Amino acid sequence: MQFSGHPVSFFYPWRFISRELYRSVMVDFRDHGADRLVIVQEWMERILADHVFYLDLLEMVRDADMKLFEVHAPNGPHWDLSCVFEGRRGPMIEGHKRALCYAAETGCRTYTIHIGAGQYNRFRMPIPKLREAALRTLDELVPHAEKLGVVIAVENSFEPPNTPDEVLFLLEHFNSPALGCCYDAGHANVMAPAPGKRQELYCSVMKEIWDGHVIEYPDALGRLAPHVVTAHLHDNDGYRDAHALPGSGSVDWPVILSGLAACPNLISVQSEVHCDRAENEVTPGRICRKFADLFA
């Protein structure tokens, strides 16, 4: 599947099914027009811990006539760029370096990573301290990625440490071809102003993270466009991160797709629709059909 001449890769919550079912799900994606999968964060954590799993995964992907094309880095406070705990930083950086090697070895072009919000959410750690930690992490990772030919893609999210401004700060600081942005359309929609949008309707998670008043960011794509190398595509109602099918929420898809098609450094786009949320009522086939229609 292609979008404006760029490959489309598909996310799936593999942790909720047994390995015996992996190939069937891969074949279902293939039979509905997909040909590329994302190495999701759970897969990469498993690969780092179990080389036999990596070999088995390569075999299953080959037998299903699919390809691996993107990586989502392991995430959480112990993996995020902004990890400040010195006892964890060494293993975290080494883990990402190994993961980048696996990304290159499998032919994956992008490595999406989070700045991270866990430390802020739990301890209200000062954002300048988190920013400095993220810079130090990227000081180590960017030269490594450049040697491997993989682009680290920093993802925008919806918490104070992960705003478009914070992403831009990191990208402009390094100004490296090995560092770009993963534009997350769903996250941007949660943070975007819209006619009639009301602060009191934000979900409890957003209210707590922002201490009761969400600072909204208009036109995140326009601001990030020069740096966008890949994108996470999913929908929501503007108030919570639902990872729903495009068309089921309030994302303005014609505007977003037009903007993505014009991004000068775009490598790929990704479906990040979540099948593990009952309210989404989606299957691999339904996801593929929706994206095929969206890109037609």
Question: Language-model segments: what does each one mean?
Answer:
Residues M1-E105, D139, S176, G180, ...:
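N-terminal pre-domain/capping segments
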Residues G5-W14, I39-W43, E70-N75, I113-I115, ...:
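A cross-domain feature marking catalytic cores of carbohydrate-active enzymes
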Residues F11-L21, V40-L55, W79-S82, G118-R124, ...:
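Acidic-and-aromatic substrate-binding clefts and catalytic sites of carbohydrate-active enzymes
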Residues E20-L21, D50-D56, R89, I93-H96, ...:
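Charged helix-capping and loop-helix junction motifs
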Residues S24, M60-D63, S82-Y183, V190:
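Active-site acidic/histidine proton-transfer and metal-coordination neighborhood
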Residues F29, V61, M92, A103, ...:
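Conserved, mostly hydrophobic/aromatic
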Residues L37, V71, R136-S250:
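Acidic/histidine-rich catalytic cores of soluble enzymes
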